[in-house]
Amino acid sequence: MKWLEIQVTTSQEAEEAVTGILYDLGAGGVVIKNPNDVKELAQTSEWDYFDPSLLEEGEEVKISAYFLITTDITDKVNFLKERIWELKSFGINVGNVKVEVSEVDEEDWADSWKKYYKPLKVGKRIVVRPLWEEYSPKEGEIVIDLDPGMAFGTGTHETTKMCLQFLEDIVKPGAIVFDVGCGSGILSIAASKLGASYVYGADVDEMAVKIARENVKLNGLENVEIFQSDLLKNFRGKADVIVANIIADAIIRLIPDVLPHLKEEGLFLASGIIKDRFEEVKERAEEFFEIIDMKEEKEWLSILMKKKG
C-alpha cells in the first residue's frame, strides 16, 4: 500500500505543537527525528553504540507523518501550513519551516524508525539489542534481544529504563515475577535473565501479546508465559515481584488487586507515572503499601512498594 509522507522541518520549540497538528489532521503514524535526543544519549553511558553521523544533523527537528492518499491531501497540506504559521502568534518560534510531500511504501515508513534504535545499556548490566543490530556483550552484561514492533517497551523510554534498573536490584534467583501490561515483553524477558524461576506477563492488547511472545521466543526463554489479561484479572497465584509499567489511571485501578497476588515479603513496582499525577497515585498506593524507593527521570516517576506492617 502507498502512503503519503508529509515531512515538516521545524524548531525544537515547535516539535510538540507541530506533531499535535499532524495527528489532528489524521496521520496514521509519526516519526520524529530530534538531534538533541541523540546528543543527550551520546553524552551518557547508556548508549554503547551509535552511528556518529547522527551527531551531525544540526539543530532542526524533522517530523514525518504518514497519511492515506486521498483527494483532499492538498487541502491538508495548506491547512498544515496555516496552522504552523499561527503558532507564531502564540509566541512559538517555529524556525525555518519546510514542508515536503512524497509517496512511500507502507514497509518503508513502518521500518524507518529502526535506523535510530541502537543497542542501549540500561542500568548496570542490562543491554537492549534491537534484532537487526550487531552487539558484542562485555563481561557480566545481560543482553535482551528485542523487536518491539508496534508494542510499547524498547528500553529507551524513561519509564521502561527505570523499571529495568529497579529489576536489576530486586529480582532474586528463583523469584516469581508478574509483569502487568507487558507491552513488548521487555520487562518479562529481563526478569527471566536476571534469575527469576518463572515469569508471567500479560497485556490487554492482542497485538502486544503476539509481539511479546515472539520476543520471548527470540531470547530462547522457556520460563516466561505471555497471555492476554486486563491487569491482574487472569493471573493466578502469588509473586515475589509484581511490576506494572502502565499509565497512572490503570495503576490506581490496579493497586487494591495487587495485595492478594503478592507474597508477604513481595515487592510491587509501579511505573509510567507522569509527575502531574504522582500525588494522586501516591495517595492511593499508601492506603495499601509502604513506599520504600523511588526513581525520577524527566517528567516520569517509578515507585517501589512493599506491604504495610
From Swiss-Prot:
Family matches, as SUPFAM superfamilies: S-adenosyl-L-methionine-dependent methyltransferases
Family note: Belongs to the methyltransferase superfamily. PrmA family.
Source organism phylogeny: Bacteria, Bacillati, Bacillota, Clostridia, Thermoanaerobacterales
HAMAP family xref list: Methyltr_PrmA (MF_00735)
Keyword Amino-acid biosynthesis among record annotations: no
Location(s) in or outside the cell: Cytoplasm
GO molecular function, one term: protein-lysine N-methyltransferase activity
CDD domains associated with the record: AdoMet_MTases (cd02440)
The protein's name in its UniProt record: Ribosomal protein L11 methyltransferase
GO cellular component terms, A-Z: cytoplasm
Keywords for this protein: Cytoplasm, Methyltransferase, S-adenosyl-L-methionine, Transferase
Main location, first listed in the record: cytoplasm
Listed InterPro entries: Ribosomal_L11_MeTrfase_PrmA, Ribosomal_PrmA_MeTrfase, SAM-dependent_MTases_sf
Source species: Caldanaerobacter subterraneus subsp. tengcongensis (strain DSM 15242 / JCM 11007 / NBRC 100824 / MB4) (Thermoanaerobacter tengcongensis)
GO biological process terms held by the UniProt record: methylation
Pfam annotation, one family: PrmA
